[in-house]
Amino acid sequence: MAASVENRQFSHIEAGLSRSFKPRSDSPVRGCNFPPPNSTNFQKKPNSTIFLDYSSSEDDDDDDEKNEYLQMIKKGNSELEPSVHDSRDEGTADNWIERNFSLIRLTGKHPFNSEPPLNRLMHHGFITPVPLHYVRNHGPVPKGTWDDWTVEVTGLVKRPMKFTMDQLVNEFPSRELPVTLVCAGNRRKEQNMVKQTIGFNWGAAAVSTTVWRGVPLRALLKRYGVFSKNKGALNVCFEGADVLPGGGGSKYGTSIKKEFAMDPARDIIIAYMQNGEKLAPDHGFPVRMIIPGFIGGRMVKWIKRIIVTTQESDSYYHFKDNRVLPPHVDAELANTEAWWYKPEYIINELNINSVITTPCHEEILPINAWTTQRPYTLRGYSYSGGGKKVTRVEVTLDGGETWQVCTLDHPEKPTKYGKYWCWCFWSLEVEVLDLLSAKEIAVRAWDETLNTQPEKLIWNVMGMMNNCWFRVKMNVCKPHKGEIGIVFEHPTQPGNQSGGWMAKERHLEISAEAPPTLKKSISTPFMNTASKMYSMSEVRKHSSADSAWIIVHGHIYDATRFLKDHPGGSDSILINAGTDCTEEFDAIHSDKAKKLLEEFRIGELLTTGYTSDSPGNSVHGSSSFSSFLAPIKELVPAQRSVALIPREKIPCKLIDKQSISPDVRKFRFALPSEDQVLGLPVGKHIFLCAVIDDKLCMRAYTPTSTIDEVGYFELVVKIYFKGIHPKFPNGGQMSQYLDSLQLGSFLDVKGPLGHIEYQGKGNFLVHGKQKFAKKLAMIAGGTGITPVYQVMQAILKDPEDDTEMYVVYANRTEDDILLKEELDSWAEKIPERVKVWYVVQDSIKEGWKYSLGFISEAILREHIPEPSHTTLALACGPPPMIQFAVNPNLEKMGYDIKDSLLVF
């Protein structure tokens, strides 16, 4: 922890650090000259004049302002370390993109969503270096080239056509101006601390300002003859190139009203340059929308189509993103009552907001005879939407009883229409003794329409537009022996980083709500209490079946006594034992399971104390960029004979995809090394992991390839499309995501998991206990055939394994039967050992020789063996099938379902 009172001001004209880096070889315009040099082959002589519209003045002030921005860009680039290929992008579709290592990742490895450390963002002042600009990606970054990229203008226009990038640059007037971009989820983690939203944890740095150059949208639409309002032209829709899983596979798209698009005062541009360079891949290369004063979600990147329509965009992301619904509406209610489609809740313009950036999180201000003789300067940023000027920022040290008006710094001048498109900065000198007597600092801003920020947080299901007073808490501490100081705490830290006063208060609230009864833990010698604190190193020691601890949302649970009762088998717990498995737990467990977890809580995770090298170290004292470096990974051998590594996710590349039927696909994924086998025991399964709509999604699958295949594994997957089954209108989240994957895409795989393992020659290991059978009654429903198929494969591959198999396989229709060709082939070639019987609810084909309806006692009696000490039943299918068809009918036949039925 930095203990310093050098209250340094980072204004936009401050001299840069004495540091320089060589320009990248692929970036000839590293110096950010305006316009870029001809050597880039980027811009030919334009047919219309390029003009700068920074302000309303008509004199040399424009040139002065342009030069000032240029100096800021040069200064920022000179202080910035080069972007690199981040090891965290290895195995993802974004592995070709260079990124700044200090960006804080908010959604794991992929997709890339990030914000800079708040102190680094503020260090650069008004203009943000492009590598530090926050990033919001819904999926992989599309690849494209300048020469091949086209944008289509269509819909209600007289002359629909496509234009190239060279045409955009050379045949249209351009405009260049600084614009602040803000994600509507800025400060969302504060909302997640109150109640979890459906969004990930943005901190307070989802905001950046750069200089954008592009063609005014109104000029483009005029050129192509946009129709009038009377002829139905009411909206302008934008569609990107990125193919995303939402809605069963769709492009990112949204729309704005046509009067916005045609309003010259709104300065809406189709941008192709940022800070004097071509757009970076993460920011929309080669072309994107910039809509000043609007939320970032309306500014479509990698734009491919502009459509003038009567109706607003029908994109999944236009309706299911960027809405502020009333606080009582949760995700379930929003879906059942169609709240997403109510136009009054859409977000367009930004709201008024302000943040305290100095003091930074965990900064310490020593209290002594010297520091108390000079004021301390509080600092921060503020912005508003719609071009409205921030006119006042106020700070309170007494909970809102009194307010002090801050000094404002507006580095931009208004446009000729009086608009302000950028953030501003505020500062206030306060007496140190006043800070010592206060408990918190709070800030609020006002804009020219006299809108201000609410005192209290207003929760909404998407966690959007949080703009309550930003509060920094203060506590007295002892940074050194014989010395006292004030330690400052921000409300949260971005992403999954620990820290912040809201996290502490949440833990205290949960502890107060915990039941008073004490529960004895099997694996720990003490009584369980919610208040006991453990370090991460202590948790890591409990990673075995003898003592299995897990961390979920900062709470520590001893799951040892639940190992034998877990529906997915002990492997499902042990694969995460000794780790923080918050994301994975939330991805695969219901609310009921989350409530059951509380019984096993033994304490809380001890967060990092106040140290000078913490992530939020003060920018006022000595700091090093090393604090932003990712942990150095331990070197491991590059080649392994087995791909799966317990407790780790491995990236696997999609190398082949075949359509077996309209809704069945066979996927082949390459393992990390060509000489590896997957390493999945027969009978167990793997998890496929993907971030879909900003949340981790994990689903269990059993490969259909044999266990000894080298270099790859295969999955046969039924795709559950949206709008097909009335009970599941959105379809299957993971199966639709898989169907949308392009060849070359990567997917994370984790395993092995499961409580059943077939060891050959009729031997099974179930929950660690041996079982044996000469005959197997194999009952499957739908996609539940895959683990049964896997066991059959292993048996038939071993010439010494003479286990008999009797398969009853249920589906809705004949077309839903998976792997039928393979099953029928085995039954035909080895009829004495393999018998297969199908059950379908409805048959539309003539000559159907199998059963109709549902699995019944009569069907089972006819097609599976009678119970005996050498007979086991294996079952996999939907829970209702197991509960209402398999269990009762096997019991009627005399099976001991507790001992002789194995359910995958």
UniProtKB/Swiss-Prot annotation:
<keyword id="KW-0500">Molybdenum</keyword>
<dbReference type="GO" id="GO:0009703">
    <property type="term" value="F:nitrate reductase (NADH) activity"/>
</dbReference>
<feature type="binding site">
    <location>
        <position position="721"/>
    </location>
    <ligand>
        <name>FAD</name>
    </ligand>
</feature>
<dbReference type="GO" id="GO:0071949">
    <property type="term" value="F:FAD binding"/>
</dbReference>
<feature type="binding site">
    <location>
        <begin position="699"/>
        <end position="702"/>
    </location>
    <ligand>
        <name>FAD</name>
    </ligand>
</feature>
<dbReference type="InterPro" id="IPR001709">
    <property type="entry name" value="Flavoprot_Pyr_Nucl_cyt_Rdtase"/>
</dbReference>
<dbReference type="Pfam" id="PF00970">
    <property type="entry name" value="FAD_binding_6"/>
</dbReference>
<keyword id="KW-0560">Oxidoreductase</keyword>
<feature type="region of interest" description="Disordered">
    <location>
        <begin position="1"/>
        <end position="65"/>
    </location>
</feature>
<comment type="similarity">
    <text>Belongs to the nitrate reductase family.</text>
</comment>
<keyword id="KW-0408">Iron</keyword>
<comment type="function">
    <text>Nitrate reductase is a key enzyme involved in the first step of nitrate assimilation in plants, fungi and bacteria.</text>
</comment>
<feature type="domain" description="FAD-binding FR-type">
    <location>
        <begin position="647"/>
        <end position="759"/>
    </location>
</feature>
<dbReference type="Pfam" id="PF03404">
    <property type="entry name" value="Mo-co_dimer"/>
</dbReference>
<feature type="compositionally biased region" description="Acidic residues">
    <location>
        <begin position="56"/>
        <end position="65"/>
    </location>
</feature>
<dbReference type="GO" id="GO:0020037">
    <property type="term" value="F:heme binding"/>
</dbReference>
<feature type="binding site">
    <location>
        <position position="786"/>
    </location>
    <ligand>
        <name>FAD</name>
    </ligand>
</feature>
<feature type="binding site">
    <location>
        <position position="183"/>
    </location>
    <ligand>
        <name>Mo-molybdopterin</name>
    </ligand>
</feature>
<dbReference type="InterPro" id="IPR017938">
    <property type="entry name" value="Riboflavin_synthase-like_b-brl"/>
</dbReference>
<dbReference type="InterPro" id="IPR022407">
    <property type="entry name" value="OxRdtase_Mopterin_BS"/>
</dbReference>
<dbReference type="GO" id="GO:0050464">
    <property type="term" value="F:nitrate reductase (NADPH) activity"/>
</dbReference>
<keyword id="KW-0479">Metal-binding</keyword>
<dbReference type="InterPro" id="IPR018506">
    <property type="entry name" value="Cyt_B5_heme-BS"/>
</dbReference>
<comment type="subunit">
    <text>Homodimer.</text>
</comment>
<dbReference type="InterPro" id="IPR001199">
    <property type="entry name" value="Cyt_B5-like_heme/steroid-bd"/>
</dbReference>
<dbReference type="InterPro" id="IPR008335">
    <property type="entry name" value="Mopterin_OxRdtase_euk"/>
</dbReference>
<dbReference type="InterPro" id="IPR005066">
    <property type="entry name" value="MoCF_OxRdtse_dimer"/>
</dbReference>
<feature type="binding site">
    <location>
        <begin position="733"/>
        <end position="735"/>
    </location>
    <ligand>
        <name>FAD</name>
    </ligand>
</feature>
<dbReference type="InterPro" id="IPR039261">
    <property type="entry name" value="FNR_nucleotide-bd"/>
</dbReference>
<dbReference type="GO" id="GO:0030151">
    <property type="term" value="F:molybdenum ion binding"/>
</dbReference>
<dbReference type="GO" id="GO:0006809">
    <property type="term" value="P:nitric oxide biosynthetic process"/>
</dbReference>
<keyword id="KW-0520">NAD</keyword>
<feature type="compositionally biased region" description="Polar residues">
    <location>
        <begin position="1"/>
        <end position="10"/>
    </location>
</feature>
<feature type="binding site" description="axial binding residue">
    <location>
        <position position="589"/>
    </location>
    <ligand>
        <name>heme</name>
    </ligand>
</feature>
<dbReference type="InterPro" id="IPR014756">
    <property type="entry name" value="Ig_E-set"/>
</dbReference>
<keyword id="KW-1015">Disulfide bond</keyword>
<dbReference type="InterPro" id="IPR036400">
    <property type="entry name" value="Cyt_B5-like_heme/steroid_sf"/>
</dbReference>
<dbReference type="Pfam" id="PF00175">
    <property type="entry name" value="NAD_binding_1"/>
</dbReference>
<dbReference type="InterPro" id="IPR012137">
    <property type="entry name" value="Nitr_rd_NADH"/>
</dbReference>
<dbReference type="GO" id="GO:0042128">
    <property type="term" value="P:nitrate assimilation"/>
</dbReference>
<dbReference type="InterPro" id="IPR000572">
    <property type="entry name" value="OxRdtase_Mopterin-bd_dom"/>
</dbReference>
<dbReference type="Pfam" id="PF00174">
    <property type="entry name" value="Oxidored_molyb"/>
</dbReference>
